[in-house]
Amino acid sequence: MTLPPQPSRLKPPRNTSSLSLRWRVMLLAMSMVAMVVVLMSVAVYAVVSRALYDDIDNQLHSRARLLIESGSLAADPGKAIEGTAYSDVNAMLVNPGRSIYTANQQGQTLPLGEAEKDVISGELLLSLRTANHQRILAVHLTNGSSLLISKSLAPTGQVLGRLGTVLLIVGGVGVAVAAIAGGMVARAGLRPVGRLTQAAERVARTDDLRPIPVFGSDELARLTEAFNMMLRALTESRERQARLVSDAGHELRTPLTSLRTNVELLMASQAPGAPRLPEEEMAGLRADVIAQIEELSTLVGDLVDLTRDEAGGVVYETVDMAEVVDRSLERVRRRRNDIEFDVNVVGWQVYGDAAGLARAVLNLLDNAAKWSPPGGRVGVRLTQTDPVHAELVVSDQGPGIPEAERRLVFERFYRSTAARAMPGSGLGLAIVKQVVLKHGGALRVEDTVPGGNPPGTSFYVMLPGRPLTPGGNGTAPVPAAQFDPDMRSAGSRADRRVIKNTETNGKSRSASKEL
């Protein structure tokens, strides 16, 4: 018997405070100061109160000691007790014969309780307690008499009351000052956050991406610097987007205009009563239309590749570069069967975007084939340079690239004066650069034959990865985070690919010689 599924318990959303950060900082400072003030006030009140009560006890003991040691209680007890009336204490002397001598302050009487009675009866020698707002000391003397002295606590209570009032006022002022200071500190400290907020709102409303001034070197200053970096990145992104749209529009306009002209001419020639164009011209127009459509398709495909890489969401997998080179060579050979390809490729695996790597290699080979003269040779070499890097070199025997233009050839839509007469979108090498950098590689351009005529062009692409050993599955140690762990039988596949490239190479050489 299966139980029905239990409904999932959703956690209630957390309550978020509606108070601003400034108010929260101020309230926090005020609360902390209030807590400290309360603790300090309680401590001060307790210490002062204890000191005052100890002082009263000391006074009572001193008076009793003075009366006892002076001998006046034995000589003239009545006079001795009456003399205390001129001080601030109440006194009583109880003799064994039950004669009692008292002297009280105006409006006061010395209270007698169980403790005092025990002292008078001799059960206790000393008693000290508080009763009826008085501090009472009872002492049993050696002659059997008992001396009782008390002091009013009213003056002490007044002092403690004034102390409590002062502490309350001082504490309240301290809390108020803490609240004001906390508000000022929060306002000053959060001023950079306010500037960041205003800048973010300004960016959301307008296209104003001006950086924010940075003051100091604290955490808020670093936050401002990070925000400025984000603004600069956003500015560059918008500039690249605007430049891409502008360049794409310009590049699309030319083939579209030519295509429209040719289509309109073909339509006009087919209109009733219109003069017929010669068949040769019609065939030329149709060929131009097909070529222009292919040019548009290539341009749109390159744009899609660029935007796909920038948008992200690419699936990474283990890519065998030997297979990528092999497939790219097959496509290029179909377009240029009049040139020779000299291929030397080792087994090498890269963890990355398979489609992007294939497009980058194809663009390099297409570029080399496009600039190679009939009967020329294109070199393709993939060699391992260190345990975790391999270098792909694509060389041609073309006119070469001037040193001043070598950095520009990787820019979008850049085409040199010599390249404008050749087919292409100006995006191929830009895609190569984007793919290589995305995979943590590097690339450079050099002459194939420095000082030669023609010098040719060689593209060097460095890619991180790991090798495949021919005839086995051993591999060099590489960081595990970069690659898939399952690499079984990889070496044998690499061996077969190298043989296949060599055989195909031989066929291309013989074919080129026959041509």
UniProtKB/Swiss-Prot annotation:
GO cellular component, one term: plasma membrane
Protein name: Signal transduction histidine-protein kinase/phosphatase MprB
Record PTM: Autophosphorylated.
HAMP domain boundaries: 187-239
InterPro entries recorded: 2C_sensor_his_kinase (IPR050980), HAMP_dom (IPR003660), HATPase_C_sf (IPR036890), His_kinase_dom (IPR005467), HisK_dim/P_dom (IPR003661), HisK_dim/P_sf (IPR036097), Sig_transdc_His_kin-like_C (IPR004358)
Organism lineage: Bacteria, Bacillati, Actinomycetota, Actinomycetes, Mycobacteriales
Cofactor: Mg(2+); Mn(2+)
Tagged with keyword 4Fe-4S: no
Entry's EC annotation: 2.7.13.3, 3.1.3.-
Organism: Mycobacterium sp. (strain JLS)
Recorded GO MF terms: ATP binding; phosphoprotein phosphatase activity; phosphorelay sensor kinase activity
Membrane-spanning intervals of the chain: 25-45, 166-186
Modified residues (Phosphohistidine): H250
Extracellular side: 46-165
UniProt keywords, alphabetically: ATP-binding, Cell membrane, Hydrolase, Kinase, Magnesium, Manganese, Membrane, Nucleotide-binding, Phosphoprotein, Protein phosphatase, Stress response, Transferase, Transmembrane, Transmembrane helix, Two-component regulatory system, Virulence
